[in-house]
A protein has these predicted regions:
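A composition/biophysics-driven feature that prefers long, compositionally simple stretches
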Residues: 1-117
Length: 117
């Protein structure tokens, strides 16, 4: 019998090459540096962006939610998108930074993914 608790909650998939984004790497770096200055001044360790607009502004990834939540988590040294498994490796290819994929077979895997960053 298959134990459902052995299934992955999150994973990464770096398949294919990064696609061209709407803005340059330097522009995304500038945007993130500005946000990180505010974070440092307020002693904030991480920011979780959940609106489509903010995710796209800081990461370049524009998604269609299909009823599933997405995020961009910004820390002092990383910018990581959090995406649903339905998109496979596309979010990594189409974002400035890394990506973590959550599976939706178990409740709250999205929050586990966000919390892991």
């Amino acid at each position: 019998m298959f134990d459902t608790f052995d299934r992955l909650e999150t994973f990464t998939s770096h398949n294919g090459d990064k696609a061209p984004l709407p803005f340059s790497k330097a522009e995304y770096d500038r945007r993130l540096a500005s946000l990180r200055q505010i974070m440092a001044a307020q002693d904030i360790g991480a920011v979780v962006l959940t609106s489509m607009h903010n995710v796209a502004y800081y990461s370049g990834f524009l998604y269609c939610a299909f009823g599933r939540p997405y995020a961009c988590v910004v820390t002092a040294d990383a910018c990581t998108t959090v995406s649903a498994n339905i998109d496979a490796g596309q979010p990594w290819r189409r974002s400035h930074g890394d990506n973590v994929i959550y599976t939706d077979w178990k409740r709250d895997n999205y929050w586990r993914a966000v919390g892991s960053l």
